[in-house]
Each structure stands twice: as structure tokens, then as C-alpha cells.
């Protein structure tokens, strides 16, 4: 059984894709928590709870921002590895999300160095819905990619050993 650079790329990508799946699951949970906190009508009029809610939203947004750049870098590493390994089909499947990540990064708010997830704007229902849909779409993409990479690890090793 031979071990090629392409097989190594798929194995490393498989492990890193699992971490991206956990990142996105955390995003989904955080958005759901923001949505639940936003819709709780009992505590809307409680001024003592308002300060705590604002701190909670700021904390969640800060944690979300810390996961954005690593996610973009890991996915960029996927594309770079597949380009070096000459895995053109896999690279072609990953390029659209890479371009979306680049577009999202370069169209971040101009007023600061933060990538996205501003505590004030995230509580807008439309933005929160958009972020949640984006997270679900990324989860679907990363799950499908995970199983594709798993298949390609086996196919790459089997192809080389034959």
C-alpha cells in the first residue's frame, strides 16, 4: 500500500473538516441562543436583565468572531493542498466556498478590524436569519465534503496500491 501526497492531503483534510464541522455547529448553537434570547417576551421589560443580555450578546459575538478567521484559513489550506496535489475535481468543489469566504472577508464593515458579527447588527432579525441560514448551508457543505474526503482517502490509497 503506497502513501501519496494526495492521500496525505485527504487524510489531513478529513481531520480539519471535522474541526470545521464543530466550528459551524457552535455557530448554529450561538445563533439559536441569540434568537431565543431575542424572542423571550417575559424578560424584555426587565431593566436589570437588559444589561446582562447585552453582555451575553457581546460575549457570543466575540466568540463567533474568533472562529471566523481560522475557518477561512483552514478552508484556504484545503484549496492550496488540493491544488498542489493536482486534485482538480476536489479543488473545483471547494473553490465556490473559498470565493464566498474571500468576498465575505473583504466586504466586512469598514469601521473596524472586526470581520463580522457586530453585537448591534446581529440582533437585527434579518441579519440573524441570514447568519443562521449561512451556518446551516456551511454545515451541509462540510458534512458532504467530509464524506467525500473519506471516500477519496480510500479511493486514492486503493488506486495507488493496485
Swiss-Prot record:
Main location as per UniProt: membrane
InterPro entries named among the record's database cross-references: Cornichon (IPR003377), Cornichon_conserved (IPR033466)
A Pfam family it matches: Cornichon
Sorted UniProt keywords: Membrane, Transmembrane, Transmembrane helix
Biological process according to GO: vesicle-mediated transport
Span of the signal peptide: none
GO cellular component: membrane
Lumenal side: 32-72, 162
Location(s) in or outside the cell: Membrane
PROSITE patterns, per database record: CORNICHON
Residue spans crossing the bilayer: 11-31, 73-93, 139-161
This protein's name: Protein cornichon homolog 2
Natural source organism: Xenopus tropicalis
Upper taxonomic lineage: Eukaryota, Metazoa, Chordata, Craniata, Vertebrata
Gene: cnih2
Amino acid at each position: 500500500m503506497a502513501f501519496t501526497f494526495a492521500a496525505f492531503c485527504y487524510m489531513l483534510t478529513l481531520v480539519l473538516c471535522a474541526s470545521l464541522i464543530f466550528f459551524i455547529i457552535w455557530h448554529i448553537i450561538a445563533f439559536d441562543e441569540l434568537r431565543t434570547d431575542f424572542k423571550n417576551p417575559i424578560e424584555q421589560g426587565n431593566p436589570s436583565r437588559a444589561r446582562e443580555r447585552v453582555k451575553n450578546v457581546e460575549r457570543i459575538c466575540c466568540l463567533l468572531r474568533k472562529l471566523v478567521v481560522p475557518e477561512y484559513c483552514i478552508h484556504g489550506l484545503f484549496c492550496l493542498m488540493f491544488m498542489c496535489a493536482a486534485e482538480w475535481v476536489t479543488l473545483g468543489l471547494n473553490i465556490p466556498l473559498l470565493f464566498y469566504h474571500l468576498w465575505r472577508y473583504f466586504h466586512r464593515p469598514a469601521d473596524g478590524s472586526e470581520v463580522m458579527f457586530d453585537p448591534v447588527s446581529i440582533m437585527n432579525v434579518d441579519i440573524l436569519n441570514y447568519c443562521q441560514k449561512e451556518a446551516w448551508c456551511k454545515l451541509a457543505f462540510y458534512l458532504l465534503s467530509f464524506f467525500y474526503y473519506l471516500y477519496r482517502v480510500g479511493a486514492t490509497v486503493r488506486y495507488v496500491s493496485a
